[in-house]
């Protein structure tokens, strides 16, 4: 089987598995883990949009750090939600996750430390505290069947 055919087959298998999953925590975790695997990513975070228009950390995974919080782990995530709007009501365009949620666009940053477009100070603080070095960041909005962004 050719690589493109294998990837297409895998996406179909993932889609079938996701449509069959009834447990929301397992479903969200599977989405994140499959996205990490498809993107060959070391880490990933799933945010859920709240009624207050914030993005709540729902699941965090980082293979190098052995970090697994949220989802089915039972490990609480003690990080405040990301604001989608600033205090003055303007869109929070400096945070990549809120920008993706507000615009509905997928964003791919080659190096978070070289980006002038977005504020990665939270990422850098995490890196300093753990000894990790975040490199590329792929941010993908998650839409429901009505095409509303429900997470990132």
Positions of PLM-derived features:
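Signal-transducing coupling segments at domain and membrane junctions
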Residues: 92-98, 105-106, 110-136
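Amphipathic alpha-helical regulatory segments at dimerization interfaces
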Residues: 17-20, 29-38, 98-99, 103, ...
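GAF sensory/regulatory domain recognition
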Residues: 45-91, 114-115
